[in-house]
Amino acid sequence: MAEASERLYRVQYAKSGRASCKKCSESIPKDSLRMAIMVQSPMFDGKVPHWYHFSCFWKVGQSIRHPDVEVDGFSELRWDDQQKVKKTAEAGGVAGKGQDGSGGKAEKTLGDFAAEYAKSNRSMCKGCLEKIEKGQMRLSKKMVDPEKPQLGMIDRWYHPTCFVKKRDELGFRPEYSASQLKGFSLLSAEDKEALKKQLPAIKNEGKRKGDEVDGTDEVAKKKSRKETDKYSKLEKALKAQNELIWNIKDELKKACSTNDLKELLIFNQQQVPSGESAILDRVADGMAFGALLPCKECSGQLVFKSDAYYCTGDVTAWTKCMVKTQNPSRKEWVTPKEFREISYLKKLKVKKQDRIFPPESSAPITVHWPLSVTSAPTAVNSSAPADKPLSNMKILTLGKLSQNKDEAKAVIEKLGGKLTGSANKASLCISIKKEVEKMNKKMEEVKEANIRVVSEDFLQDVSASTKSLQDLLSAHSLSPWGAEVKAEPGEVVAPRGKSAAPSKKSKGCFKEEGVNKSEKRMKLTLKGGAAVDPDSGLEHSAHVLEKGGKVFSATLGLVDIVKGTNSYYKLQLLEDDKESRYWIFRSWGRLGTVIGSNKLEQMPSKEEAVEQFMKLYEEKTGNAWHSKNFTKYPKKFYPLEIDYGQDEEAVKKLTVKPGTKSKLPKPVQELVGMIFDVDSMKKALVEYEIDLQKMPLGKLSRRQIQAAYSILSEVQQPVSQGSSESQILDLSNRFYTLIPHDFGMKKPPLLNNADSVQAKVEMLDNLLDIEVAYSLLRGGSDDSSKDPIDVNYEKLKTDIKVVDRDSEEAEVIRKYVKNTHATTHNAYDLEVIDIFKIEREGESQRYKPFRQLHNRRLLWHGSRTTNFAGILSQGLRIAPPEAPVTGYMFGKGIYFADMVSKSANYCHTSQGDPIGLIMLGEVALGNMYELKHASHISKLPKGKHSVKGLGKTTPDPSASITLEGVEVPLGTGIPSGVNDTALLYNEYIVYDIAQVNLKYLLKLKFNFKTSLW
């Protein structure tokens, strides 16, 4: 596997004669100069070099301006070859006759820039994001698409005027001209002339003598001469140093065997690397400058790489050391007595010196592989303008929508998209629920192409909502299938899927990933203790072996933020259902992408299969299969506790469309169906970038979620104290390994600020509640005589009664909703659909001691619909001890509000999903500890029973009413008189679950005010 590098290019002397040139297909001779483009491998989570002869490299259109910055391995070349690379780069990639050793004439055309007439009207200008019409002249620059780096260098098209505006940014140098564009000769005479005027070669004319003013130019010249002299001296020193190192290498190659060199490294307490050239480099470095002492931070081995010495050790089992220095500590290099017989080593005397480094280039380092330092979910179409969120997308409409086709087309085009009639070309499908349920031929094509289906309301929300496009797609999704929606990159259509591995038939780069069969969501076939991976092709004829109570199936994860890896490895031992036949199946790749592969290997016997399984497991994790206590080792995988249990069928039975057997009132039936909606649970996880392929709903263990909480607790200290990057890296790597995330080709973001920690705390809170809901669905009786709705209702252990709309209590509650809607929460109005009176089993008894406490109020608590199965069955809970206290404004407690809209905001509804649930609970507040700013409370002051966060607005206290000793603050909002507070509205927090008695559950419709029409 290739070594990870942020640089797109690599140069070195060929280590063997086995590699062939990607341009001419001829072999590259050993020790000859070769150059490579680093390309994402389609087979594993890493990059591989595509090697070229030196001259061929420039012919395929590579434009390098600063080889010392852009090319990995440049400084390790011989001095003459460094100059050769520099001069060729300066000449715009023209190697010149005879320069490549083959004597071939180099091409003068710029291979990475092209001009042509658009072959269709499908491409989009990367400058203005407008369509390029068929037959219109267009210019391109070959670049790596950060979302699909496995495609390598692809054309990115521009209108000529847009290209001219971005000339410098695109690397079209001043000395380049239009006539050097590939395809220029095929343009019409008129277009050639126009393009020559737009893209002329710009000559840098020197100043005339008469330009000098008051001697200032003379001062500048003297300064320039000084800098030139200084640079010239440094160049000479670097050249002498380079020649010294290469002289040592050349002599060592003649005088010593590879084993001799290894012995020299071991004697000087240096690690022995793999590969002859690496061993030679390390010995030469030690002889020239001294033996390197271990890293002070981790005791690892320091190694020279281009611009510094980097530590190759590990701070912890999860994270590599980040130490980098140009002045490492050294000791004298010692040659053992037995080696002094070698004449060269006997004569060699090197004066102790420090390694000289070239000055840091002022050229910006272009990072070609996508980086991410934010924890917020990335917009699906991040390149799109704010007013055109559907730019580069093709939309298919199916079924009878509220608008006719022309109206829908107008709206879609207004948002930057295009209407299409083909499922294979579509990025997204807009339809209605009935069409998905009906599953006609056209919808089957949509499913086959793995295109996500969303409701028509999505078009309204996408222009009005502040949520990311991914969140809106999740909220409006109608289909259980669907790859992540991506904008179309010009003419290369390659939406990213979420399959564990590509089809065995797929070879090389993916031309059209969207139609890859393996991209469809995996259907896991459960047999006995685990699910057989469908990529094995044996899901219907074999099962996972279970022996001694242990299931021979393992899902492993490895995250390294520095390298940008987010890898999985799956291992299964499969046994034939009928015969004594055994297979080892393994799959590997990058989470959330089609990058990866798999292997099915038939074994001669059960014993050999078990032995091979255990060998592979130990190779990947460093742990024996039967070891009870797992130890994480550096660069090794970590097992995920994913439960592929036998309860899936029970879930399916209880989520089927309810029949007519239910004796519950219709509103209660609808409420229970809403609470246990599995699709809503999946949508919630997708919003948090959870990878549902590697962590199917309900499959991650509670223990692993709690371990993730503990990591976030550890993160809060280094984040608040500004600790070392290594510590934050370590904790981030551990977190993302425990909770598999889908980041596509982006690097996993560091958990390096309070907001990112807060977002992940919220994610784990929801994961826990979803885990409760799913556990309820899986557990309990399998009584086929009962309606599924009734079975699920019983699991809530809550008496739910519909409140008569005309009753006095319903009137009071509606008034409370109307009066306490805050003026700043003006994006929607709230409409009460149903009011339910609830009584949780055992809660009244638990609350009994607090009934005598003064200051009891009826307050609001809002949450996602997916959390209500957990809330009703287990009550409102305080975050677990493992959760970080900084994830909550006033510490870990249960939060309430007296303004309905403050709590309603936590329902996370949208125009496409406007129904939310909110609760009213009787809360025993007693003596309140009043605060104006965040305070991470872990223990209340003596004599206090709760915290009140003071807001600038409060319900009018004169309008409050009292029902059975409980205050209902249903007055309209008025200024509270508290101005120096961080809160707009009041918050109430209790730290004992027994202080809460849930009374009512409201089903609300959020009537959003913003619309496209």
From Swiss-Prot:
Placement of covalent cross-link Glycyl lysine isopeptide (Lys-Gly) (interchain with G-Cter in SUMO2): K192, K203, K249, K467, K486, K511, K527, K747
Active site: E987 (for poly [adp-ribose] polymerase activity)
Modified positions (N6-(ADP-ribosyl)lysine) in chain numbering: K520
Domain PARP alpha-helical residue range list: 661-778
N6-acetyllysine: modified positions: K97, K105, K131, K599, K620
Major location category of this protein: nucleus
Location(s) in or outside the cell: Chromosome; Nucleus; Nucleus, Nucleolus; Cytoplasm, Cytosol
Modified residues annotated as PolyADP-ribosyl glutamic acid in this record: E407, E413, E435, E437, E444, E445, E448, E456, E484, E488, E491, E512, E513, E519
UniProt KW keywords: Acetylation, ADP-ribosylation, Allosteric enzyme, Apoptosis, Chromosome, Cytoplasm, DNA damage, DNA repair, DNA-binding, Glycosyltransferase, Immunity, Innate immunity, Isopeptide bond, Metal-binding, NAD, Nucleotidyltransferase, Nucleus, Phosphoprotein, Repeat, S-nitrosylation, Transcription, Transcription regulation, Transferase, Ubl conjugation, Zinc, Zinc-finger
Compositional bias ranges of the Low complexity kind: 494-503
Residue stretches making up the BRCT domain: 385-476
Modified sites of kind PolyADP-ribosyl aspartic acid: D387
Positions annotated to bind NAD(+): H861, G862, S863, G870, R877, S903
Site (Cleavage): D214, G215
Mod. after translation: Poly-ADP-ribosylated on serine, glutamate and aspartate residues by autocatalysis. Auto-ADP-ribosylation on serine takes place following interaction with HPF1. Auto poly-ADP-ribosylation on serine residues promotes its dissociation from chromatin. Poly-ADP-ribosylated by PARP2; poly-ADP-ribosylation mediates the recruitment of CHD1L to DNA damage sites. Mono-ADP-ribosylated at Lys-520 by SIRT6 in response to oxidative stress, promoting recruitment to double-strand breaks (DSBs) sites. S-nitrosylated, leading to inhibit transcription regulation activity.
The reaction(s) this protein catalyses: NAD(+) + (ADP-D-ribosyl)n-acceptor = nicotinamide + (ADP-D-ribosyl)n+1-acceptor + H(+); L-seryl-[protein] + NAD(+) = O-(ADP-D-ribosyl)-L-seryl-[protein] + nicotinamide + H(+); L-aspartyl-[protein] + NAD(+) = 4-O-(ADP-D-ribosyl)-L-aspartyl-[protein] + nicotinamide; L-glutamyl-[protein] + NAD(+) = 5-O-(ADP-D-ribosyl)-L-glutamyl-[protein] + nicotinamide
Region (Automodification domain) residue spans: 373-523
UniProt cross-references to SUPFAM superfamilies, sorted A to Z: ADP-ribosylation, BRCT domain, Domain of poly(ADP-ribose) polymerase, Glucocorticoid receptor-like (DNA-binding domain), WGR domain-like
Binding site for Zn(2+) 1: C21, C24, H53, C56
Location of ADP-ribosylserine modifications: S499, S503, S506, S518
Phenotype reported upon loss of the gene: Mice show a complete lack of nuclear poly-ADP-ribosylation. Mice are however viable and fertile. Moreover, repair of UV and MNNG induced DNA damage are not affected. However, about 30% of the mutant mice developed pathological skin aberrations on a mixed 129/Sv x C57B1/6 genetic background. Mice lacking both Parp1 and Parp2 are not viable and die at the onset of gastrulation. Female mice lacking both Parp1 and Parp2 in the uterus display infertility; defects are caused by decidualization failure and pregnancy loss.
Subunit: Homodimer; PARP-type zinc-fingers from separate PARP1 molecules form a dimer module that specifically recognizes DNA strand breaks. Heterodimer; heterodimerizes with PARP2. Interacts (via the PARP catalytic domain) with HPF1. Interacts with NMNAT1. Interacts with nucleosomes; with a preference for nucleosomes containing H2A.X. Interacts with APTX. Component of a base excision repair (BER) complex, containing at least XRCC1, PARP1, PARP2, POLB and LRIG3. Interacts with SRY. The SWAP complex consists of NPM1, NCL, PARP1 and SWAP70. Interacts with TIAM2.
Assigned protein family: Belongs to the ARTD/PARP family.
Domain comment, as recorded: The two PARP-type zinc-fingers (also named Zn1 and Zn2) specifically recognize DNA strand breaks: PARP-type zinc-finger 1 binds PARP-type zinc-finger 2 from a separate PARP1 molecule to form a dimeric module that specifically recognizes DNA strand breaks. The PADR1-type (also named Zn3) zinc-finger mediates an interdomain contact and is required for the ability of PARP1 to regulate chromatin structure.
Protein name: Poly [ADP-ribose] polymerase 1
Species whose genome carries this gene: Mus musculus
Gene: Parp1
